[in-house]
Amino acid sequence: MKPLHIIIVSIVVVVAGVSCRNHANELLNPNTAPYNTPLEQFEVVWNGINNGYAFWDIDPTDWDSVYTVYKPRFEELSNQTSVPTATLQNYYADMCSRLIDHHMAVVIRNPKPAADDTITTFVINPGNSEVRTRPYYHERFSDSLLLVCIDKLRSTALVDTMAYCNTPQGSILACNINGIAYLHLSKFMLTEALNNNDSSSQAIAKAYRLFYDLAVHADTLKGIILDQRGNVGGYVNDFDYVLAPFIDKPLTLGTTRRKEGLARYDYSVWIPFTIEPAAEHRVPDVPIVALADINSASMSELTTYAVTLLPNGCFVGERTYGAHGPLFSNFEINYSGTFGDKNLQKTLHYVYMSNDVFKPNDGNILEGKGFRPNHQVLFNSEKMNAGDDVQLNAAIDIILNNKFPTNP
């Protein structure tokens, strides 16, 4: 797939220059830097973010001011015999609260916990904190609620074919809704599942084949619904399965730029982010509707945006989560993205963040903001619990009654 080839080229270019930076890498590598105190931990985490964060040229956070304010506070903590984990958590939460990378997660284990601390590890998610302040915020709805709504449609004979499975890899629901090929994924795991033969992968493949046959091979097709509500993201190569079958020429979504190098503003050039058509494809002359909500993040947002670029595509639902930066990180090569030990064994920190910035075709970077729908339909918990999915119903109505919205 073209985006993947671009990423590989970018990495090769950076590798060629690593040999002249080995000494700096040893000094500044936050994957191996030792420490014993809260101040030393703060220095490693602050510098790791300072060197590896991808959004400094558009992020409003004054990171130098953060250092000036918090270094004395961490010095004070380091002089104490023990440190309450709650205090440490409050410091890191405030430090990172204004960072716009909505993939970001900062995991910290207290190096000097108090004896009565029952919890010594915490996670800071700036994106989650921001999203929860939005007036339309709601929790992710369960598959069981969605299945109740689908069963209600089945009772009226609108749904005649369905396949569903919930596996450790994620869940998938495919069905025929009155001639509409419908697909719901909890995450993008098709690249993995369709290339393996274990029982979970086979169940996912069976459900996907139902959707594919309906969308690509069915004689009568009224529309396609790609439901990404609550989808947390996943493999970017899943474009090969959810969008490439419906295009006959390359589709450019925008450009990506990688953070590479120790300086804050060391970036790669902007490179086109393009989806290639599948070898077997069908360009439908019917509406393709992307369903997405506030809990749609990362790859699900890019898929939703890609649908809006199609002449017969639209987005129904809510403004999305706002985590658009791809993650293909190797900090020791690019000096960007995720660093630390996920298991908190080699280091007492783990910082997960994007190392690329995605810029849509219109040039408006929406990291931390999310994509807006062509047709807004807010989640209605009361109706959903009663088996009435107002967002899905709106998508069906657009397709069956020719109510295609214009771009916002």
Listing of model-derived features with the role each one plays in the protein:
Residues 16-19:
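C-terminal motif of bacterial Sec signal peptides marking the signal peptidase cleavage site
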Residues 21-248, 252-254, 334-339, 390, ...:
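Flexible, low-complexity junctional segments that flank or bridge functional domains
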Residues 362, 367-408:
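Low-complexity, Gly/Ser/Thr/Pro-rich intrinsically disordered linker/tail segments
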Residues 1-5, 22:
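Positively charged n-region of N-terminal signal peptides that target proteins for export
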Residues 187-191, 230-236, 252-253, 260-262, ...:
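Solvent-exposed loop/turn segments at secondary-structure junctions
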Residues 233-289, 295, 328, 336, ...:
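Gly/Ser/Thr-rich loop/hinge elements
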Residues 181-184, 223-227, 253-255, 287-292, ...:
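Structural recognition of the beta-strand scaffold that forms the well-ordered cores
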Residues 317-337:
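C-terminal soluble interaction/assembly domains
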